[in-house]
Amino acid sequence: VHALVLPPGPALSEAVRHALTGEGPAVLPLSPDLPRPALAATLAALRPTHVVTQDGVRREPDGEPSDAALIIATSGSTGAPKGVELTAEALLASARASLARLGAREGDRWLCCLPPSHISGAQVLVRSLLCGTEPIVHSRFSPEEVAASGADHVSLVPTQLRRMLDAGAGVAAFRTILLGGAAAPPGLLAEARAAGARIVTTYGSSETSGGCVYDGVPLDGVEVKIGGDGRVRIAGPVLFSGYRLRDERPFEGGWFVTSDLGSIEDGRLTVLGRADDVINTGGRKVVAGVVAEVLAAHPAVRDVVVVGRPDPEWGEITVAVVVPRDTREVTLDELRDFAKERLPAYAAPRAVELVSQIPLLPNGKPDMVALKNRN
């Protein structure tokens, strides 16, 4: 296993290519921007045999080999580093199904402006390989440079799409914008589509080789169902083989049990939120993602994340962290009234915080630890 502490570019793409064909070792892409303590913790937890940097290759004395092609280090937004082990077969099955669904062709160009240390960025590299082209790589996100890239397809997170729209960058330049990593506010999707963008929303995780459900419909070969506990379960050739050096196996009879709550209607999956984002307030269960989706439709709200915080009276209270639209402030009473018109009264937020932007992890998802622990 080679831990690649390298910026996005040809060396990293070539290492992924060799891992997929079996000509090279398994690769563990890591961001060179990781703080030193975080890098040390990740290497200690995942134990690669070699560490590759721009200065050379270093052999690790306690490294462990792997049968995987790609290992993605993921802690979500809450935990210690885990290594999601993905075989070449799983990665290629995902990429082929994605290209088929999108109608992508040989020779199509993909733009990589997400970190290859995350599955969304890594899969852009895999799709490029299958299209027979070199990925266009942007190590730093610039709306204007993205719009002018000349790529046919791009994978973005909602924050990046929001910045492109705010900058007036040409979102219609792409045949496809895959949008994932976090729930997209309905208003953002409507605005982007009105600007001529072909948006395809994706749902998945590192454990499913990235997005495996497009616009609510599973990719070919992927099956989705809801268990008795309300959690989404996924089966198919795209699944990971396990967590590196851990016995943890979140499977039930071949189905991967996710941490997401969902519902299926007419064959279309709706993700309601994370099971660990259920807020227990006064004995009532509130799904934070459902409340956030409702509040996102308020005309004064540009972006919102809903979290639970400890409270001596209620156990937990529902807190809306809001980025206001333009300069208009939005009050707690406004948001509570808006929510109570659409949800049970107990689900309405009991506190609101106005912020200039939502704190994000490197993969574009909200930093839930920071949001839950804000003073």
Where do the PLM segments sit?
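AMP-binding/adenylate-forming catalytic core of the ANL superfamily
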Residues: 236, 261-347
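Conserved ATP/PPi-binding loop(s) of AMP-dependent carboxylate-activating enzymes
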Residues: 218, 227-254, 274, 286
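Conserved pre-ATP/AMP-binding loop-to-beta segment of ANL
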Residues: 7-8, 58-73, 80, 103-109
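Flexible, low-complexity linker/hinge segments
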Residues: 1, 36-40, 46-68, 94-95
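Gly/Ser/Thr-rich phosphate-binding loop
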Residues: 164-218, 223-225
